[in-house]
């Protein structure tokens, strides 16, 4: 039976769940309420592989990043089945994903400014959005 949406971890009781090896999300899910879901969790080499398990019908849910789920769906262009993506908040997991950024040595302000300007230009011209869409991803502002 397919899951339409997940609002809390208890919605996953008695469901097969795929997760990414070594991820904080996997640890949080397996440790939730003293291991409530631990026996239902299977670990895969990465989040995209975990998400693919749901697409093939082998698993009921995958606890992965939105980008990983979208990438797995995008790769299956042959399957028009609509898939529901739900946000699930767990203690120890960032509710809006992990913030990412560009790191530049503190004394290289010129490079930092150039990178910031380049990214701003890509965003303003819509090129960043097109890049994300070309890979089946949603561009979310930080």
Residues of each region from the PLM?
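Proline/Glycine/Serine-rich low-complexity intrinsically disordered segments
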Residues: 1-142
């Amino acid at each position: 039976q397919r899951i339409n949406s997940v609002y809390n971890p208890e919605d996953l009781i008695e469901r097969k769940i795929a997760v990414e090896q070594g991820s904080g999300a996997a640890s949080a899910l397996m440790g939730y309420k003293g291991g409530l879901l631990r026996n239902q969790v299977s670990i895969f080499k990465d989040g995209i592989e975990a998400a693919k398990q749901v697409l093939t019908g082998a698993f009921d849910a995958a606890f992965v990043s939105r980008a990983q789920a979208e990438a797995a769906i995008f790769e299956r262009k042959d399957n028009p089945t609509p898939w529901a993506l739900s946000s699930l908040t767990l203690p120890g997991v960032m509710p809006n994903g992990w913030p990412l950024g560009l790191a530049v040595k503190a004394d290289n302000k010129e490079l930092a400014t150039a990178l910031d300007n380049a990214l701003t230009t890509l965003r303003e011209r819509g090129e960043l959005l097109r890049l994300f869409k070309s890979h089946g991803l949603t561009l979310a502002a930080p």
